[in-house]
Curated annotation (Swiss-Prot):
This is Crossover junction endodeoxyribonuclease RuvC. Mg(2+) 1 binds at residues 7, 141. It comes from Paracidovorax citrulli (strain AAC00-1) (Acidovorax citrulli). Disulfide bonds: none annotated. Keywords: Cytoplasm, DNA damage, DNA recombination, DNA repair, DNA-binding, Endonuclease, Hydrolase, Magnesium, Metal-binding, Nuclease. The keyword Cytoplasm applies. GO terms for biological process: DNA recombination; DNA repair.
Amino acid sequence: MRILGIDPGLQTTGFGVVDVDGHHLSYVASGTIRTTGAALGDLPGRLKILFDGITEVAARYQPDVATVEIVFVNVNPQSTLLLGQARGACVTALVASRLPVAEYTALQMKKAVVGHGRAAKSQVQEMVRRLLQLPGLPGTDAADALGLAITHAHAGAAMARLGEATSLNRRQHAMYRSGRAL
C-alpha cells in the first residue's frame, strides 16, 4: 500500500510518500509545497497553489490513501482559521484525486513515531530518518508528513489485527481498508 502524508500549512505544506509491505516501510518521496509565488495577502492565490501542488503530488506518486494532520486550535484564532483554509485546500485536492483521507492529530503522530505525544520536531525528524533508513534528516514539514504516513501504516496494521481477531469488527475493518471510515 502506498500512503501519502500531508502536513498542511499556508506558507509551507509538507508531503511524504511511503510504501508499506507488511511491517516493512519504504521511503518513496517527500518535499514541500511553498506558496511564496502568491502575494502575501493573496489568500485565494495561495490556496490554489496548495490545491494544484497536492493534485500534482497525488498524480505523480499514485497513493492508495492519504492522511492529513488535524488542525489544532492555538492562541491566535486568525492563524487557526488561515491554517484551516490551507488544510481545506489540501483535503479538497485529495478528494478530487479520488483518494480516501485519514486524519490524525500531531499528538497521535508523535506518539506513533516517537513514543510520546510531546516530542520535539527534531525527535520526529530523527525517528522518521531511522524508521525509513534515510541518509539524512528530512525537513521539519516533510518529516511531519512522513510521520503521518507512518502513523497510518501502524494504524492500518493494528486495525488488520483487530479485524482478524474479532468477527464483530470485520465490517468496520472492511470499511477502513476501503477508506470509507476512520
